[in-house]
Amino acid sequence: MNPHFLQSAAWQSFQEALGRKVYRQKGIDWEFMAILEPGTRLSPSRLYCPYGPTVSSIKGLKSALKALTKLATSLGVKFVRVEPLGVKFNAKDFRLKKVNYSQPAHTWQIDLNRSSDEIISQMKQNNRNIYRNYRKKGLSYRISNNPNDCKYLIKLLHGVAAHNNITIHSDKYLQTQADVLLPINSAKLHFISLESKVIAAALTYEDEKTCYYAHAGASHEYRKLSASTALLAEIIINAKKDGKLICDLYGITTSQDKNHRWAGFTRFKKSFGGYEVDLSETYDLPINKSVYKLYQAAKFLRHKIVKLKQRIK
């Protein structure tokens, strides 16, 4: 089995640093790490397995879901949210109910088991030119393992959020990732600077085989310098130098709608070469069925109210 980074011991340490209770179990053909998420005013309590459970057979999936059901019942939670990886399955066979996006169901990966020249040759010509010439524009690249440097990424992400009118993770969430993951070599910070000013930054997750392009932001003011392109190209090549086998660009859309909210960064990621990988849709396994039905009905009603308010505006 090959668990995703979000099922790793490093991710468990991060979740525990946020004050969350984490449970880990395994058996024949299955294993999982589940996070206890207490109930709120808008949602009942649940167990959440990000990109899990990890299984190697249908029997293993059945056993994992049985173990999760038993754990959830003992904790008094109302449902379990899962994203099983390892086998193809029919959700109806396991009473799983598909829900809207939690983690991306598809990702884009680059095979690093080739020479750097071969990897670069698969990038679009514009990307290759930017990678080869960005230093001539006065730009420089560096890697940091210092958690204090996360402030540069956080600042850029706030700029991205303001410019694009999107919501991002809290400063505490991102800083805690840096505080926990960087000292144990499970993450890196990457920067492109113009003279001494950071204009593009990214945080990658790192395991033995894979580099995950997790969080990234760049200055809109300096967008014509294509710092984001130079940064990702450097991340890919440095992952190769570190002996990684895969660079996972972490989430794309398969929609052909040019107006899809992920269309832009999907095109950006695909421009570096690579291939699509199907992960898992997100599913709920109700434990307390009556409470879960009320939760779904309330969520549907809130969605309708939001849509109505948007039309009125």
Regions found by a protein language model. Give the residues of each.
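A conserved beta-strand-loop-helix scaffold within acyl/acetyltransferase catalytic domains
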Residues: 1-43, 84-89, 93-103, 107-222, ...
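Active-site/acyl-donor-binding loops of N-acyltransferases
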Residues: 17, 21-22, 40-41, 91-117, ...
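A gly/proline- and charged-residue-enriched helix-loop-helix capping module
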Residues: 54-91
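Aromatic (often tryptophan-rich) hydrophobic motifs at membrane interfaces
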Residues: 63-70, 177-179, 183-288
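The substrate-binding groove and active-site-proximal loops of carbohydrate-active enzymes
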Residues: 50-56, 222-223
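Hydrophobic faces of well-ordered beta-strands that scaffold small-molecule active sites
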Residues: 47-49, 247
